[in-house]
Amino acid sequence: MKRREFVKTIGAYGIAGLLPSLTVPYRLLPSLLIPMDDAQSDHLKAYGVAYRAIQAGLKAEWLLNYRGGSFLIPDADALRRDAALNGVRTEPVDEGAVTTIRGEIEASNMDAVPLEKAPKVAVYAPPNAAPWYDAVTMALQYAGISFTKIWDPQVIGGALREYDWLHLHHEDFTGQYSKFFLIYSGMPWLADMVQSNSQMARQLGFQTVPDLKKAVARGIRSYVDNGGFLFAMCTATETIDLALAAHNVDIAATFADGTPIDPDADAKLDWSQAFAFTGGHLEPNPLIASFSDIDGHQVNAGSRRQPLGAFKLFNFSAKIDPVPTMLVQNHRQVIPDFYGLTTSFLRNRLKPGATVLAEEEGAPWVKYIHSDLGKGTWTFFGGHDPEDPQHQIGDPPTDLSLHPHSPGYRLILNNVLFPAAKKRELKT
């Protein structure tokens, strides 16, 4: 197939209609570079263009550490149109320019990683989730990356196996309604949360919401153990580990399950079941919207609350450690911090195998961590919304068209594309 016929085929059928029988060697085709440095006009939508290219069966490459983590895709009319309609800057590059780029990559701390398969994405969220509930949902919608919302019935029913990538956000897997029950009593959104969770627990055969959430946490752990990719932010990071560690312990306040917390709960927690954390101490006060001492910032804990600073992304060896390198691709290395119910993770609460991707220099906490579990991987990112640092309940959802270059949201979208990369054994 000649290039003219290749372009005509894509233009006639659209990106998604491109036939998988295309046999022209990828590297012989003219290419489009999607720069991800300061030349890019919309960093976030650029991820969507790359995602849709591989979703159509086209070969793409992620150029790690090259101009902010750029993408290389085939030069086709449909891809040019997609980029133009979304305000994404592309640069046509001929074979000579590509050869020059590859030479620079080979000689530097860079790498070219093939992106082979668009991951099937699931977002765990209750049906009544508010617009300010989930920064990842907003990022996916803005970038134009397709996803499916799932909740407890799908997890308990085993549907997670249908998805490559799962996101968790503002979910309290201890079943205590984010410990808002007493603080926000009487608020309609809280009443809806309690009613929907209680009804779902009964429907699925659990006596209490905490029992249901523990089972959901175990289902998610099994999903990762069997090869799934998990990305969690905010409350979900801390509470899923608490729920896993408390599989045989009552850690929920009386308002959540009708019984008090086990007074010896701290000593009975089984951290071997957790993803990231160990040795945490619970916050037993039902009036304090904090779960444990895992979170370094304690945003709702009065005198324990810590001010926001900035976190710095680590530099990794792209050729030796491609996975953490992918997760930190950015056009900024230092990023302003942002609160969440869980904002950060105390370093002395991390399991030894956790890789720190970003930290606040000189602070006892870290921001962004990653590791493997079984055949899969997990990544935890503290905080709620990178462009809403204070994040108050009831705030309007962030308008990402006002933040097209958000470095914090780029970290979210790195995680979406990471499962698309051709698997390669980590060398360290």
Label every model-predicted segment.
Residues 5-25:
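N-terminal export signals
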Residues 26-134, 143, 383:
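Hydrophobic targeting/anchoring helices
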Residues 29-35, 41-72, 250, 349-355, ...:
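Extracellular ligand-binding/catalytic regions of CAZymes and related secreted enzymes
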Residues 32, 37, 41, 71-81, ...:
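Helical hinge/lid and interdomain linker segments adjacent to catalytic or ligand-binding clefts
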Residues 105-109, 153-155, 364-367:
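Alpha-helical scaffolding within the catalytic cores
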Residues 114-117, 158-161, 223, 372-374:
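Extracellular/periplasmic catalytic domains that process cell-envelope and extracellular macromolecules
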Residues 123, 167-168, 230-232, 378-382:
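Structural recognition of the beta-strand scaffold that forms the well-ordered cores
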Residues 134, 141, 238, 249, ...:
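Catalytic beta-strand/loop cores that center a nucleophilic Ser/Cys/Thr
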